[in-house]
């Protein structure tokens, strides 16, 4: 009796906990479902052990500066970074901000237009912000740290009358003439900026320069309307698949078919709850993986019910047939799902972007299938038999146990 109570408690938790997670924390939708931009960046040249981590941190600061909600920024391999920005209004602006190295340099500009060696770098920058120049045009003000301020004072003291070029990624932003020594470590960058350009430059300087040059190797933008259409189409496809499966299971297995359909709904809630719990985003490939695992869940029930039929044909009581049916089906269910789980693991570690989304959903679906196929459906079937006082010959359709 105590064992039965514990089973019911576990069944309640399996249903209630994922549902509670879903209620308070909705599943995040991937880029292909809610619209946005995906950019794959690749580092160029020599890469140190912590280079990509530094790149990720800087890119994250840049993305945060433009106010993107829930950005996805993840490392891929040894030299790539995937950046997903959902719901942004100006994808091109975001791409330019992300892909700029933002290497700030101060050089003396010679009379022939050439530039001298680098005298001061952006690493000495303490802060940057948008301001206005003497004629009211948008500009970028900056402040240097103490060491940078001392170097800046020395540069201006020794080069009075010369032009000091302020370079960003080897492009001159402005080249004011030095009239006197500048102390305090503050200055201003002018360059006929619009307010948006000045704001972007200030954000770049504040986030810091990337330690290596990066190249955009993939750029994909999905419109919000396309995302809505995708959700609608996949939702309809999923409901049709669920309806066909439900009718099929009841038509073939009667009461166990009803149990399988209930377990299928619990499986769906469990997968979505797990997705929400780990903060993973649901993508189109992920939905494909989700629907695939529903099919696998049905397959697990089919294996079990056929084993129960075999036991009933051998003359076992209904209770013993259910127990042995689940016991005999267990190895086949575990073997099939573990194999799928291994494939999903390979896809996750070797794949990128959409493939990873498919692998994550498939993995969670396998876990949910094992739980519902081995435990949940068994408890529900026993509960049905007890509650409705189902007899041995009533479990399946008439004549089902006479089949060879």
Curated annotation (Swiss-Prot):
Pfam families: Sec_GG, SecD_1st, SecD_SecF_C, SecDF_P1_head. GO terms for biological process: intracellular protein transmembrane transport; protein targeting; protein transport by the Sec complex. It is found in: Cell inner membrane. It is a multi-pass membrane protein. GO terms for cellular component: plasma membrane. Its main location: membrane. The chain crosses the membrane at residues 7-27, 239-259, 262-282, 283-303, 330-350, 357-377. Keywords: Cell inner membrane, Cell membrane, Membrane, Protein transport, Translocation, Transmembrane, Transmembrane helix, Transport. One of its GO terms (molecular function) is protein-transporting ATPase activity. Forms a complex with SecF. Part of the essential Sec protein translocation apparatus which comprises SecA, SecYEG and auxiliary proteins SecDF. Other proteins may also be involved. Part of the Sec protein translocase complex. Interacts with the SecYEG preprotein conducting channel. SecDF uses the proton motive force (PMF) to complete protein translocation after the ATP-dependent function of SecA. Belongs to the SecD/SecF family. SecD subfamily. This is Protein translocase subunit SecD. It comes from Leptotrichia buccalis (strain ATCC 14201 / DSM 1135 / JCM 12969 / NCTC 10249 / C-1013-b). The gene is secD.
């Amino acid at each position: 009796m105590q064992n039965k109570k514990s089973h019911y408690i576990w069944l309640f938790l399996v249903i209630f906990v994922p549902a509670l997670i879903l209620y308070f924390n909705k599943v995040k939708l991937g880029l292909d479902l809610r619209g946005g931009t995906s950019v794959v960046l690749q580092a160029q040249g020599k890469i140190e052990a912590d280079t990509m981590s530094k790149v990720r941190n800087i890119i994250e600061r840049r993305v945060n500066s433009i106010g993107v909600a829930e950005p996805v920024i993840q490392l891929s391999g040894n030299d790539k970074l995937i950046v997903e920005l959902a719901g942004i209004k100006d994808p091109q602006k975001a791409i330019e901000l992300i892909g700029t190295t933002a290497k700030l340099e101060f050089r003396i500009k010679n009379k022939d237009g050439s530039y001298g060696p680098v005298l001061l770098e952006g690493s000495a920058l303490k802060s940057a912000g948008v301001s206005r120049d003497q004629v009211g045009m948008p500009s970028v003000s900056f402040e240097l740290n103490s060491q940078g301020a001392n170097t800046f004072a020395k540069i201006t003291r020794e080069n009075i009358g010369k032009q000091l070029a302020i370079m960003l990624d080897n492009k001159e932003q402005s080249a004011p003439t030095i009239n006197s020594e500048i102390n305090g470590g503050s200055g201003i960058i002018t360059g006929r900026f619009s307010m948006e350009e000045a704001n972007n430059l200030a954000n770049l300087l504040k986030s810091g320069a990337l330690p290596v040059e990066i190249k955009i190797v993939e750029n994909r933008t999905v419109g919000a309307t396309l995302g809505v259409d995708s959700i609608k189409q996949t939702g309809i496809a999923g409901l049709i698949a669920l309806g066909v499966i439900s009718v099929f299971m009841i038509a073939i297995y009667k009461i166990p078919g009803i149990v399988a359909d209930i377990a299928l709904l619990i499986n769906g809630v469990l997968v979505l709850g797990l997705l929400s719990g780990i903060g993973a985003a649901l993508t189109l490939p992920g939905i494909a993986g989700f629907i695939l695992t529903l099919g696998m869940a049905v397959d697990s029930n089919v294996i079990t019910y056929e084993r129960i039929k075999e036991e009933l044909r051998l003359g076992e009581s209904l209770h013993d047939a259910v127990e042995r049916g689940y016991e005999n089906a267990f190895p086949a269910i575990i073997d099939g799902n573990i194999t799928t789980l291994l494939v999903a693991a390979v896809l996750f570690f070797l794949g990128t972007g959409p493939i990873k989304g498919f692998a994550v959903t498939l993995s969670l679906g396998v876990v949910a299938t094992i739980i519902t196929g081995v435990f949940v459906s068994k408890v529900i079937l026993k509960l049905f038999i007890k509650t409705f006082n189902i007899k041995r010959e009533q479990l399946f359709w008439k004549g089902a146990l006479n089949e060879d």
